[in-house]
UniProtKB/Swiss-Prot annotation:
Keyword presence, Secreted: no
Protein's name according to its UniProt entry: Exodeoxyribonuclease 7 large subunit
HAMAP family according to UniProt: Exonuc_7_L
Keyword Cell inner membrane carried by entry: no
CDD domains registered for this protein in UniProt: ExoVII_LU_OBF (cd04489)
NCBIfam families (alphabetical): xseA (TIGR00237)
Main location: cytoplasm
UniProt-listed InterPro entries: Exonuc_VII_L, Exonuc_VII_lsu_C, OB-fold_nuc-bd_dom
Organism: Chlamydia muridarum (strain MoPn / Nigg)
GO CC annotation, single: cytoplasm
Localization per Swiss-Prot or TrEMBL: Cytoplasm
Record gene name: xseA
Family as reported in the entry's similarity comment: Belongs to the XseA family.
UniProt enzyme class: hydrolase
């Protein structure tokens, strides 16, 4: 790309670099020291591998499902097999590993393979020299540690499966620089003519390749091959293989399985072996066919694998960032919460809260009593005073009108029989009296109108028109004025402006607290 080339976007340039890297570094093997090791809950491993001059970031997807027995840590020296790629969101190149061996294990595995090939070429693993385990094994020699769980497992199985047997234990160390020589010496002792042994079990529990290395030593392999007594090798777990397994007459996946083999008759053992071979043959064909199909499937989708890994790595980084942010937020809120708790525990605040609670209860009680008293008084006023006063005012008005008529007639009579001055005086008196009567009538009308308005405002039916309702006890027919008199499932008669209804109480709250 020359200087005169048109500009490209960062993502396009990054993709070009990624394609070049993946094309030219499809398979790489790199060794170094691990740092910043992080095994995510998704099972993916993120790390950096370094030496004294450079650092290379890396990822191992689905690491946990492939290497469940050992977890790498900072400072481990490892050998990685993988490919180079680019993590586009950060614009950094990295190695995506698909195999990992610890540096020490790598050397041991190489020694294992070289020694295995050489001893096989010398005939130590030849199937023709292997012997069958006697069908009636009565005396069994066991070469193992006397203090481990291995000897206990063997004895437990023999006690359960065999009726007559004798176990002769030759105690040895099963790990360390002298272990191979001790085990070889034990085999030679058992092969002496004066000791009658039907079969030998060489056993040890599981461990790392370093722990089991004594069983890969040449001196022990040759001692097993030279034994005239059939030997069962029961070293490690089912997934562990040592050179002793190849040299022994029978390999047992576990020490307990070795005891099971001893207890079986030759015919039963042969039949089970044939069944196992048929099962393995069938299962192998199915397994190979399935793996071929899976390989074909992944070849078709190989182009999308990098996108998936990139997306998965982005999700893991995002989750880590969110976890750090969440932890910081939680710590911040915890500090505030602790401060609030210290404030709330203050004696002054407790006393104030108690005093406020007492005042609140007293105020609520006084308000309830006052409201109830006012309601009763208003009801009594409505039923007695206003009902009686309205007819009285009407009667007084009629009486005033009657007096006015009488005075009017008397004035006319006096005016007709009096002198001019008396007529003037009566005219003035009539005018004053008329004004007084009119004033009284106006006051009486205003008072009457005020009373009628108060009666209308206190009339329960008018109150109902404004959206309110009256509650009556369904059984006692009394007015309900407090929520304390109600409980769940009570029946209540409700009066509205245009009718009535019967309701059932489901829940009751007092001062924002749920009653039932």
């Amino acid at each position: 790309m020359s200087i005169t080339s048109p500009p490209v976007e960062v993502s396009v340039l990054t993709d070009s670099i990624k394609n070049l890297l993946e094309k030219n570094f499809l398979r790489v093997v790199v060794k170094g020291e691990l740092s910043n090791v992080s095994l995510q809950t998704s099972g993916h491993l993120y790390f950096a591998i370094k030496d004294s001059k450079a650092v290379l970031n890396g990822a191992f997807f689905h690491f946990r499902s492939k290497y469940f027995d050992r977890r790498p840590k900072d400072g481990d020296y490892v050998i990685l097999h993988g490919k180079l790629t680019v993590y586009a969101p950060r614009g950094q190149y990295q190695i995506v590993a698909y195999a990992l061996t610890f540096s020490g294990e790598g050397n041991l595995l190489q020694q294992f393979e070289e020694r295995k090939q050489r001893l096989a070429a010398e005939g130590y693993f030849d199937p023709k020299r292997k012997r069958q385990i006697p069908s009636e094994a009565r005396t069994i020699g066991v070469i193992t540690s006397p203090t481990g769980a291995v000897i206990q497992d063997i004895l437990r199985v023999l006690s359960r499966r065999c009726h007559q047997f004798q176990v002769i234990l030759y105690p040895v160390t099963v790990q360390g620089p002298t272990a191979a020589q001790e085990i070889s010496r034990a085999i030679q002792v058992f092969n002496q003519e004066n000791i009658k042994i039907d079969t030998l079990i060489v056993a040890r529990g599981g461990g790392s390749i370093e722990d089991l290395w004594a069983f890969n030593e040449e001196i022990l392999v040759k001692a097993i091959a030279a034994s005239s007594i059939p030997i069962i090798s029961a070293v490690g777990h089912e997934t562990d293989f040592t050179l002793c397994d190849f040299a022994a007459d029978v390999r047992a996946p576990t020490p307990s399985a070795a005891a099971e083999i001893v207890c079986k008759s030759s015919e039963q053992y042969h039949q089970e072996l044939q069944n196992l071979l048929r099962h393995l043959s069938s299962h192998s064909r199915q397994f190979i066919a399935a793996k071929k199909n899976l390989l074909s499937h992944w070849k078709k989708h190989l182009a999308t694998a990098d996108f998936y890994h990139t997306a998965q790595q982005t999700l893991d980084y995002t989750r880590l960032s969110l976890e750090r942010t969440l932890d910081a937020k939680l710590e911040h809120y915890k500090q505030h919460l602790a401060q609030y708790k210290r404030w709330l525990k203050s004696d002054i605040l407790i006393r104030v809260e108690k005093h406020l609670s007492n005042l609140n209860q007293a105020l609520e009680s006084a308000i309830k009593n006052k409201l109830y008293s006012n309601k009763v008084s208003l009801h009594q006023l409505y039923t007695s005073r206003f009902k009686n006063e309205l007819p009285n005012l009407q009667h007084r008005t009629q009486h005033a009108k009657h007096l006015l008529n009488q005075l009017s007639r008397r004035l006319h009579f006096v005016m007709a029989n009096s002198q001019e001055t008396k007529l003037q005086r009566f005219a003035r008196l009539q005018e004053e009296f008329s004004f007084m009567i009119q004033h009284l009538l106006t006051k009486a009308k205003e008072r009457c109108q005020s009373v009628q308005e108060q009666m209308a405002s206190l009339n329960p039916k008018n109150v109902l028109k404004r959206g309110f309702a009256q509650l009556f006890d369904f059984n006692k027919h009394s007015v309900i004025i407090s929520a304390e008199s109600l409980k769940q499932s009570d029946l209540v008669r409700v009066c509205l402006q245009d009718g009535e209804a019967v309701l059932s109480v489901k829940e009751v709250w007092l001062n924002n607290d749920k009653k039932g």
